[in-house]
Amino acid sequence: SAGQTTPAYAEDGVTPVGTYSIDPATGEVTFTPTEKSYTGKVTPANVQAEDTNGTKVSTTYTPSIIPAQPEAEPAKTVDVQGATQTGKPEFQGGTAMVNGEEKTVEMDDTVPAKLVDPKTGDKVDSLTVEGEGTYTVAPDGTVTFKPEPKFTGVAKGVEVVRQDKNGTPAKATYTPEVKPVTPTGTDAVTEDVQGSTQTGK
């Protein structure tokens, strides 16, 4: 009947992944996903129709959910020893062909970007790598790297994670490089007559 919904399950027949509803006037069945991360087949909805003569006919409706994996491009920056660097990996929503039409699942800008702690796997806002420096991520995915004063070379970098509107994650690395700075000096030479005090810099 109108307004009623029936649970829709994953292929295992146990895990709820959405609901079915039917328009009694047209017989059109609508599948509404509730588990946005699920992809694959959904258990079919059995639909029974009856004509004016009372003849019943049964059919099934089987939706299939095609995955759309978001993509990410890593970022690299280079600066001199001691300088704070910022870099931003680029994230794009995933696309999939559905019935000959390209569909995109956009990135979710309401969920802040995080760094992945390589030791624990936890998602964090700030991370210190011993002997290297401290990384901090802004909600939009911009990473700030504050190197330790003596650190030079290519850093191990960090993994940045964002998700699309279905909650599907995408990861990319940010790798800063620190160029060494060697202080330079110019020899000072002065000349004066014998017995005079001289200064040089």
Regions found by a protein language model. Give the residues of each.
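Conserved positions within tandem-repeat grammars
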Residues: G18-Y20, A83, A113, D125-L127, ...
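Generic structural motif
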Residues: A2, T6-P7, Y20-I22, P70-A72, ...
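Acidic, turn/loop-rich segments in luminal/extracellular domains of secretory-pathway
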Residues: E11-T59, S126-A172
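Extracellular interdomain linkers/hinges and stalk-like, low-complexity segments
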Residues: S1, P44-A45, T52-M107, G157, ...
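Acidic-enriched, low-complexity/disordered segments with a strong bias for Aspartate over Glutamate
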Residues: D12, D23, D51, D79, ...
